[in-house]
């Protein structure tokens, strides 16, 4: 369907429409859009739609990830060999998980969402799936990386259906003691930009389990399970790993990785390093980024917020094209973002946006490109 005219009122101003700017270098750097579009698919849709209205612009297409869905796809397009492994999914069905091995550095890049992601449930999440989902497949991926001779294993955290604290993952490696022995000489990285602990009001069950189908009673059960498991994790590690930043990432898989000798590192920073994002940023006159839901959390430990923070000192304008937007003009100004526009608003509803996500994003990008003013990038702010 033809999209509606994007609103200026709540999400920043793009100025008068259909006035031509000189050709620009546009950095297209989105995260994934939930289960609707991978970062690679979203970047292609934005660039294609933009070109329809501004064919003279040049593009730097650099899809991003913070360790969640798309982490392996983004890295696979830049380095190493993408491999496939049939593993146990979050509800015990067999899934075909992708991972990347870079033989030059003997580094394996894994992604939790490939083995226990929400998109692998086979339907909407429910309290029952929230209780049953596990991380066994992640342990199977780690075992495969060890068999391949990995000296470094980077595990992208995010988008998981489980809240098991990595218990299933560790069970697949033979338990805590066996996992620690197997990984003693391997550098293990828990890649995420989620800094929440395992337990408590800001822990993984209370913050993230409701997004995985859990109701209040289910959250309480999950919290109790995690509290018991945390005692074992902390004892194995010899320190309080369950309270450390990142322990709550991916349903607590972060805590499991920390307990077997891993360390926490920003997933967005890992992707930025391997995609040479700093060089791309230096060449850009405008940045177009986006994600599924753009809200306050996006500005704290997610790709879009990290991009805006990096662009601000360089005075590079940033436009966000998101599935849904819940930040007002004041919040955008504070973050250094010129405008944020909603695909759902453009399409007419969330349902229509989800039904044809790539084409709706393409259409919104085309509309935004056509409506830019003629004062050049410096006039956007």
UniProtKB/Swiss-Prot annotation:
Lineage top rank: taxon: Bacteria
SUPFAM superfamilies from the UniProt entry: Glycerate kinase I
GO molecular function: glycerate 2-kinase activity; glycerate kinase activity
Gene3D superfamilies linked to this entry: Glycerate kinase, domain 1, Glycerate kinase, domain 2
Keywords: Kinase, Transferase
GO cellular component annotations of the record: peptidoglycan-based cell wall
GO biological process terms, semicolon-separated: organic acid phosphorylation
Disulfide bonds: none
The family this protein is said to belong to: Belongs to the glycerate kinase type-1 family.
Protein name: Uncharacterized protein Rv2205c
Species of origin: Mycobacterium tuberculosis (strain ATCC 25618 / H37Rv)
Taxonomic path: Bacteria, Bacillati, Actinomycetota, Actinomycetes, Mycobacteriales
């Amino acid at each position: 369907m033809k999209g509606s005219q994007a609103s200026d009122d709540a999400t920043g101003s793009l100025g008068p429409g259909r006035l031509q700017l000189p050709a620009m270098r546009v950095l297209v750097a989105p995260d994934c859009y939930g289960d609707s579009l991978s970062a690679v698919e979203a970047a292609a849709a934005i660039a294609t739609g933009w070109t329809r209205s501004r064919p003279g612009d040049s593009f730097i297409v650099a899809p991003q990830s913070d360790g969640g869905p798309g982490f392996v796809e983004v890295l696979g397009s830049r380095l190493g060999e993408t491999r496939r492994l049939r593993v146990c999914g979050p509800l015990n069905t067999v899934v075909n998980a992708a991972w990347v091995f870079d033989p030059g550095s003997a580094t394996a890049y894994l992604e939790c969402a490939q083995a226990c992601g929400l998109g692998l449930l086979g339907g909407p999440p429910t309290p029952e799936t929230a209780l049953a989902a596990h991380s066994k497949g992640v342990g199977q991926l780690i075992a495969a990386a060890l068999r391949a001779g990995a000296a470094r294993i980077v595990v992208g955290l995010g988008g998981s259906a489980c809240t098991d604290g990595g218990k299933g993952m560790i069970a697949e490696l033979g338990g805590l003691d066996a996992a620690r022995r197997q990984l003693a000489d391997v550098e293990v990285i828990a890649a995420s930009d989620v800094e929440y602990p395992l337990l408590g009001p800001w822990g993984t069950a209370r913050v993230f389990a409701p997004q995985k189908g859990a109701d209040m009673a289910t959250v309480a059960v999950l919290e109790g399970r995690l509290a018991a498991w945390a005692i074992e994790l902390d004892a194995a590690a010899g320190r309080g790993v369950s309270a450390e930043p990142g322990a709550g990432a991916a349903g607590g898989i972060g805590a499991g990785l920390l307990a077997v000798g891993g360390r926490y590192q920003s997933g967005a920073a890992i992707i930025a390093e391997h995609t040479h994002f700093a060089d791309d940023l230096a060449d850009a006159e405008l940045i177009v980024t986006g994600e599924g839901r753009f809200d306050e959390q996006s500005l704290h430990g997610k790709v879009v917020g990290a991009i805006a923070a990096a662009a601000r000192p360089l005075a590079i304008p940033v436009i966000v094209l998101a599935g849904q937007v819940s930040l007002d003009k004041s919040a955008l100004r504070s973050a250094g973002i010129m405008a944020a526009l909603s695909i759902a608003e453009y399409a007419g509803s969330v349902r229509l946006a989800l039904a044809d996500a790539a084409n709706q994003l393409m259409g919104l990008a085309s509309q935004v490109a056509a409506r830019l003013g003629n004062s050049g990038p410096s006039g956007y702010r």
